[in-house]
């Protein structure tokens, strides 16, 4: 893929909390690309948890993400999060009210706080930002180029969860995919453009493997909220005290401090200068504070939708069983979150394709990653102390579900192997498979991979959803 060096926070590799300086302004051609994603201001922007833009982890992959010599990909599937969005409507109202309150009560706006005096909250709500749209265009380009032996001759089957921003993401992916295909002189002529073939409702009563919501006990769980509150209390009070001292007259809650930190990402990705200018909200906090913020987001995902929640991985079981069906060209066997009407029809769940793309949200993807056992090597995350990426065995919210994240599942036929091999990449990082005899390149044979997904094939702990 011709990747270049990636500047990542040093703490991710060593736990050290100081790093290299990042220039105040970067040219888009060097810091925001199809191959590498968003490398602008990486010492800060890669610490935004799930609010980080997609950035490639190819150079963080111990195993090369390139297709091994002597192998050809015979099946490829991408599961993508939607692109960068504006704050949700409910959060946006809270952000706006907080800024207005600061403007009304602060008696001084000195130095790095000066922008707050006249800052006008005018961000949209819920939908993709223009930057987020381009992320998905780039994703479609990259998917086409990576799997061009397939994409030149095959129209992918595409599904989307029912949210407008997820559907829009799928359409932008198609735009990038098809524009690249039309420029490829070796592409098979006369093929139709891809389209979103299935949109799955996100109504609370609907079965939706891309965005499950019918497991009552899980939906009522407050575990992640408790973990979030407890870890917030370990690092935010000192920030709050500093902000209140610097903004005389202002009184903040710990939650409001994290809102100001959220604004660093949202204000940056909502502007046309996303590649050359970092939001002034970002400078209100230190590098160490961003490390804690990033870890806080990882805790929320791990204890909300991952293995830290007793029913977290079970929410991804339906999708795992759909993947098994696609890999083996056999009917879906699942009684959890799958939609039997859709999955039993070749029109809405074909079993004979070799190229698939699905679009969803971060929470559902986290559950799917754990249902597939990709982070079985991750021990329960400490709820009191920041752990680096080595200690978490490669898990963090920024490394798994940034905006426009992508999970690639590949099946390949290799000259030295009789059986097809399966491997998985998360944001260009090869994640060695668990639960099956894995080779030096992180792969298992298809049949052993399927056997290893016994948790998914047995329905996980779905019976506990309604206890």
From Swiss-Prot:
Reaction catalysis annotation: 1D-myo-inositol hexakisphosphate + H2O = 1D-myo-inositol 1,2,4,5,6-pentakisphosphate + phosphate; 1D-myo-inositol 1,2,4,5,6-pentakisphosphate + H2O = 1D-myo-inositol 1,2,5,6-tetrakisphosphate + phosphate; 1D-myo-inositol 1,2,5,6-tetrakisphosphate + H2O = 1D-myo-inositol 1,2,6-trisphosphate + phosphate; 1D-myo-inositol 1,2,6-trisphosphate + H2O = 1D-myo-inositol 1,2-bisphosphate + phosphate
Keywords associated with the record: Disulfide bond, Glycoprotein, Hydrolase, Secreted, Signal
Signal peptide span: 1-23
ATP-binding in keyword set: no
InterPro entries noted in UniProt: Acid_Pase_AS, His_Pase_clade-2, His_PPase_superfam, Histidine_acid_Pase_euk
Described function: Catalyzes the phosphate monoester hydrolysis of phytic acid (myo-inositol hexakisphosphate), which results in the stepwise formation of myo-inositol pentakis-, tetrakis-, tris-, bis-, and monophosphates, as well as the liberation of inorganic phosphate. Myo-inositol 2-monophosphate is the end product. Has a broad substrate specificity and is also able to dephosphorylate other classic acid phosphatase substrates such as p-nitrophenyl phosphate, phenyl phosphate, and fructose 1,6-bisphosphate.
Name of protein: Phytase A
Species of origin: Aspergillus niger
Gene for this chain: phyA
């Amino acid at each position: 893929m011709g990747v270049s060096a990636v500047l990542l926070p040093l703490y991710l590799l060593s736990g050290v909390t100081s790093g290299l300086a990042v220039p105040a302004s970067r040219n888009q051609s060097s810091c925001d690309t199809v191959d590498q994603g968003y490398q602008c201001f990486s010492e800060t922007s890669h610490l935004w948890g799930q609010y980080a833009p997609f950035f490639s982890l190819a150079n963080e992959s111990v195993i090369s993400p390139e297709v091994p010599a002597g192998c050809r990909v015979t099946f490829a599937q991408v599961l993508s999060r939607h692109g960068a969005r504006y704050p949700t409507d409910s959060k946006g109202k809270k952000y706006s009210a907080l800024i207005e309150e600061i403007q009304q009560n602060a008696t001084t706006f000195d130095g790095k706080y000066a922008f707050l005096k006249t800052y006008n909250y005018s961000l949209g709500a819920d939908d993709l930002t223009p930057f987020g749209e381009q992320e998905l265009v780039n994703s479609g380009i990259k998917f086409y180029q990576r799997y061009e032996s397939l994409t030149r001759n095959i129209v992918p089957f595409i599904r989307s969860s029912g949210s407008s921003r997820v559907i829009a993401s799928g359409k932008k992916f198609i735009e990038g995919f098809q524009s690249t295909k039309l420029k490829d002189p070796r592409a098979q002529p006369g093929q139709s453009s891809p389209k979103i073939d299935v949109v799955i409702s996100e109504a609370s009563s609907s079965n939706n493997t891309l965005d499950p919501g019918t497991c009552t006990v899980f939906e009522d769980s407050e575990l992640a909220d408790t973990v979030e509150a407890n870890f917030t209390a370990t690092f935010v009070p000192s920030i709050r005290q500093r902000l209140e001292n610097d903004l005389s007259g202002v009184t903040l809650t710990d939650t409001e401090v994290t809102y100001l930190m959220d604004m660093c990402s949202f204000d940056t990705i909502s502007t046309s200068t996303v590649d050359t200018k970092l939001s002034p909200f970002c400078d209100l906090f230190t590098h160490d504070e961003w490390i804690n913020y990033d870890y806080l987001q990882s805790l929320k995902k791990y204890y909300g939708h991952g293995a830290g929640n007793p029913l977290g991985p079970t929410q991804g079981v339906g999708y795992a069983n759909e993947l098994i069906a696609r890999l083996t060209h056999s009917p879906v066997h699942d009684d959890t979150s799958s939609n039997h009407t859709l999955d039993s029809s070749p029109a809405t769940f074909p079993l004979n394709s070799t190229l698939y793309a699905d679009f969803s949200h971060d929470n559902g993807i986290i559950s799917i990653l754990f249902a597939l056992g990709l982070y079985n090597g991750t021990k329960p995350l400490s709820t009191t102390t920041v752990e680096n990426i080595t200690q978490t065995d490669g898990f963090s919210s920024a490394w798994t579900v940034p905006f426009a994240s992508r999970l690639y599942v590949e099946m390949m036929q290799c000259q030295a192997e009789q059986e097809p091999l399966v491997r998985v990449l998360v944001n260009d990082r090869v994640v060695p498979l668990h639960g099956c005899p894995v080779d030096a390149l992180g792969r298992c044979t298809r049949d052993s991979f399927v056997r290893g997904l016994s948790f998914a094939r047995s329905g996980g702990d779905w019976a506990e959803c309604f206890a």
